[in-house]
Amino acid sequence: MINKNLRKLKFLLIKLFRIKENAHNVSLGFTLGFLIHFIPSFGMGPILSTVGAKLFKGNPIAGFISGVALIWLFPFLFYLNVVVGETLFPYGVFPSATGMPSHGLDAGIHLGAVFFIGMIINIMLFGMVVYYLIYTIMRKYRLSFLTIVKKWEIKK
């Protein structure tokens, strides 16, 4: 099982580093593909990653690779949105609507607002960090990584 996942990782890394475009376009596509996972996309993440990368003039292949390779991160990123939003705006900060008959509705509206604010903050923060990391890796380590990959053997 682990060897199968390592082979998939190796394949996706090779595909990413062999893209014949400049580092900016590849890192932009990868970053936009990654940022889709902060938004609930209901199974459309890889498609939205590709379309988003193409729309913002990034590399759509890099967007698809990050959309497929990092789809398992969605539950953690969803929870991170709620945690960041709740840290910045704890319960009781948003004014409740007057005359609301249910306390549950108030809590649901608060949770939605907290999630949305956390999502916006996380997208901006992680967008800058991931773009910088991928750009640096593509500029400095692309060729050396591709020569190392030739020697990288994973047992079946």
Positions of PLM-derived features:
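Juxtamembrane non-transmembrane "cap" segments at the membrane-aqueous interface
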Residues: 75-100
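Transmembrane alpha-helical segments in integral membrane proteins
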Residues: 117-139
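Small-residue-enriched transmembrane helix starts and helix-helix packing motifs
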Residues: 12-36
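Membrane interface segments of multi-pass transport proteins and intramembrane proteases
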Residues: 94, 138-155
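Short, membrane-exposed interhelical loops at transmembrane-helix boundaries
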Residues: 93-113
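Membrane-spanning helices that line or support transport/gating and their immediate boundary helices
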Residues: 79-83, 87, 132-140, 144
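Transmembrane helix boundary and interhelical junction motifs in multipass membrane proteins
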Residues: 38-52, 56-79
